[in-house]
A protein has these predicted regions:
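Acidic/histidine-rich, surface-exposed loop or edge segments in extracytoplasmic proteins
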Residues: 27-37
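A cross-family detector of function-defining hotspots
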Residues: 1-26, 44-113
Length: 113
């Protein structure tokens, strides 16, 4: 029986690792999954909250906004060398409806862009 463990550096970090073990308990593979490519693979209107949590682990932040009837799960990640955030909108039925990316400006970074 194969097993996958998930190791997360969230909420402060920007990496989540899948650790895949073979039936004898030997580590076969380590993969960092908080990537733009992985987030872009989320199938809107198909993926569920369980799919998101199984792939990326618990989010760093869960929040609600007035114009969406559900939760927004936020993950921090690095896109090349740029700090970013992925905001996954999950409706009340547990289905992913929208994915939005934003820049993650570090606290105290008051540069005028």
């Amino acid at each position: 029986n194969r097993e996958r463990l998930l190791y997360s550096t969230l909420p402060a970090g920007r990496r989540v690792f899948h650790l895949d073990f073979d039936g004898a308990g030997r580590l076969e593979r380590v993969e960092q999954v908080l990537t733009l490519a992985r987030f872009s693979g989320i199938a809107l209107n198909t993926w569920t909250q369980a799919d998101v949590e199984r792939t990326f682990g618990p989010p760093m932040l869960v929040e609600r906004v007035a114009r969406f009837d559900g939760d927004i799960w936020t993950y921090r990640f690095m896109d090349d060398y740029e700090p970013r955030m992925a905001h996954i909108h999950i409706d009340r039925a547990g289905t992913v409806r929208q994915l939005v990316f934003s820049d993650d400006q570090p606290p105290g970074d008051d540069r005028d862009f």
